[in-house]
Amino acid sequence: MDVRGKISLAPLAGITDTYFRRVCKWFGVDFTYSELISADGLYRNSKKTFLLTNFSEEERPFGIQIFGKDPEILSNATMKLNELLPDFIDINLGCSVKKVVKQGYGSALLKDFRNLKDAIISVVSSTRLPVSCKMRLGYNVDKGVKIAQILQDCGVSFIAVHGRVATSLFSGKSDWESIKKIKENVNIPVIGNGDIKTPEEALSLWEESKVDGIMIGRASLGNPWIFKQVKDLIKNGKYEKPTLEERVNVLRQHYKLATDDGKKKENIYIMRKHFHWYLKGVKNIKMFKERINRTTDYSEIMEILDRIEKNG
């Protein structure tokens, strides 16, 4: 799988589900990842966990991201994922949420290189699919290169590097100089990630760091246009921002996709956060938000969107 020159959607737990990923594909994202999936849950054949692996053909190239620490469990989970035929398998080495790290998962694996190697090799040796890793810079910024080289030596095909240390969550600035240094010291493709808020920043950071590709996460929330905008900026030196009409229309299509035209009531709750993201900054949006947060009626939601569009 060639990731050079490509833009990917970062995996975000509870957000980048199959519906959002498909919307991003409409606007040119090159490849996507599943949400964070527990290897332990796959090992136990948890139905809830396996639901997170669902994807559609239009999302390809698509990777399933897992987290875990036990080599045997990771190997078992990987063999089960092989049957689902994703395009690649990704190992999460970047999640710094306390409850994840406390159990030794995510960025906690970056503390002990021996355990890290065992975990990565267990996945690589259990599949013919490309294996990637999404990593942070470790617990010390100077360890980033060493970690990346370990992953390369273990047979990882490419890495996505978030430019923060494991303890910083999203505080401070993403260190793209360290990402650049990693790129200069490994032979596998490196994808840069962190603090890309605008197409201009995406292009600037991409060019300055010399990474092979970029990954966009939080900046895509309510703004799937950003992938097309980056590509337009590269190709034409300019891009267009969506009008209110376009924002409402894509949100409407997102609702239809996620709720199956209102049949999947449970997904109406999930869509509330997307409503807020898509329409952030719209005039008089507060009263519409209050209505959206109260209703589970699909027809009413469509009527609210129509009113927002007309009032714009």
Label each PLM-derived region with a short phrase:
Residues M1-G312:
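Flavin-dependent oxidoreductase catalytic cores
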